[in-house]
């Protein structure tokens, strides 16, 4: 059984990745490692991963990607061994906002907005049961901006879920969101560039927040916790402690130490955040963004 799993969600670039990896560092928790999202199977002992051919294949791909795109690691560090979003599990059912975040696909976006995601989350749950077979006693910690679009399906599948929503003024992150989409898809399309990326991002993410806010109002507020991005950056471990306190969880000394190590690693070397961008690059202004997201 999967009991009281933690789901981190929020707009892209609001600190979801940093918070997810901090929470996942707790030895009492388990998360979705990139290679197991790609190749779902019962999680083998950590010391055997480097000899697993599937792990080695994906690790080699990321090593090549890092070498060919040295600037990308500072935007969003990815590796076969790292905790990652559960978008790959939802993609198994073709229900994922990642598609419209990486291409101009208005007909797909329209189709997705009318779908019931519940079967996708049931499959998501079965994947977690498979992957966590050897660690059934550990609490799952998961993260995906797609959860904004399907809270009802998530709660129907995981009725005791603990949901953490991250927040940051949208006008300060929209350019960053667009820049990430641009760098991820460089050379893929002549359509999904510049102002088209900006327009699509505005449509997609305003719709997601509208849906999430409307759905959230129906559930027990005790199952939700809000994190301000600036609080997370100023005091990462203090923010985590507040989350544990709200949900009645125990934060052990071992967990604190592991989180301290993870935070230090995230600020160093290739992982250190490096990002420059402008709203004007994507046909947007601060006023346009504020107007679209007013009240969300």
Where do the protein language model's features map onto the residues?
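Glycine-rich phosphate-binding P-loop
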Residues: 7-26
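Flexible, glycine/threonine-enriched loop-and-boundary segments that flank and lead into catalytic domains
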Residues: 127, 133-160
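PAPS-dependent sulfation machinery
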Residues: 38-140
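Nucleotide 5′-phosphate-binding alpha/beta core
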Residues: 1-7
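Short His-Asn-centered micro-motif
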Residues: 9-11, 141-145, 229
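Conserved phosphate-donor/acceptor-positioning beta-strand/loop module used by diverse small-molecule
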Residues: 143, 154-179
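PAPS-dependent sulfotransferases, especially Golgi type II membrane carbohydrate sulfotransferases
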Residues: 1, 104-121, 128, 132-135, ...
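Post-Walker A helix-loop "phosphate-sensing" segment adjacent to the P-loop in P-loop NTPases
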Residues: 25-35
